[in-house]
Amino acid sequence: MTDINFGNISRLEEFISRARRIAIVTHMKPDGDAMGSCIALYHCIGMYGSASAKIIINDRYPGYLDFLAAEVPDSDMIVHAQLPTEAETAIKDSDLVICLDFNAFHRADRLEAALTESKADKILIDHHLNPAREAFDLVFSETDISSASELLYHILMETVKIGHDASMLPPAAARALMTGMTTDTNNFANSTYPSTFRMASALLATGVDRDEILSRLYNQYGENRLRVLGHMMKDLLTITEDGVAYMVLDKATLRHYNVGEGDTEGFVNMPLSIAEVRMSFLIKEDDDRVRVSIRSKKGTSANTCARLYFNGGGHENAAGGKLNMPADITDITEAAGYIERTTHEFFTRNNEHKE
């Protein structure tokens, strides 16, 4: 991890100290890292005086994160999909906007216009490639780190209020940081660094109950999750000659199994356990587009593939994107052909085609 600029830490504390209303914003379809970092920052802002803070999210978080969200008053977490006017007004009325776990305003989807038009000071805390630096007054960007939650943790450790003492973190913030880091590393399975384990050790020393967090994250699913997983592995999983595994979930299947946000969490990683698979796709049909999750093994760039063919990007081995209809494909039935065609081209042009 690159050393954090101490001058920027001072500026961050100045921005927060003088703000009266703060909006904390993350990307669309917020995951554990997005919510963990936002909720942790929310709890820490109270250490800086009388500023009011609200978490503004584009759409609802997965149900397995309810235990974190329960520690934030309902009035301080606004979901645009449920209360669009209130969400946009909260951003407009804020004099400081802090964006976590995304690198450009368009990643906030329906909040993009409100963020672009906001006259507030804007701060970015993110671990993705190619941040839109020109859109922000202060940027903390680090890619050699596990998660936005870990980046936020190291920033907080450098502040005057925390002073390298994790026990000074509000307990709810410590739990949220551990949760965000755990989910983004797939429980320490990927994107882990020495700093990641130091963070985990320090948080455990403060009394964070990791066993409880793991139980909340991974042992609270509904039966439908296993049912749809079985269907996907038996009937939907396709593996190409290029070593690409993909599964396409259309709206009919999503409805049949009552698949909600978060119910397919982690599924895209599973085909990578197959020796000959080097890239895995999970395709989910939405109303006006197709959502794409991509994972890859070391030596194959999920990020490059997402940027070239799927209107997205992310990390080297974990990325996301979308297929627009009808611009990219006419309907979901064309998704399989699109994946096979584009990934074959991707591996061929990068001299990665399997012999």
Residues of each region from the PLM?
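Short, glycine/acidic-enriched loop or turn micro-motifs at the edges of active sites
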Residues: P30, F102-A104, L129, N187, ...
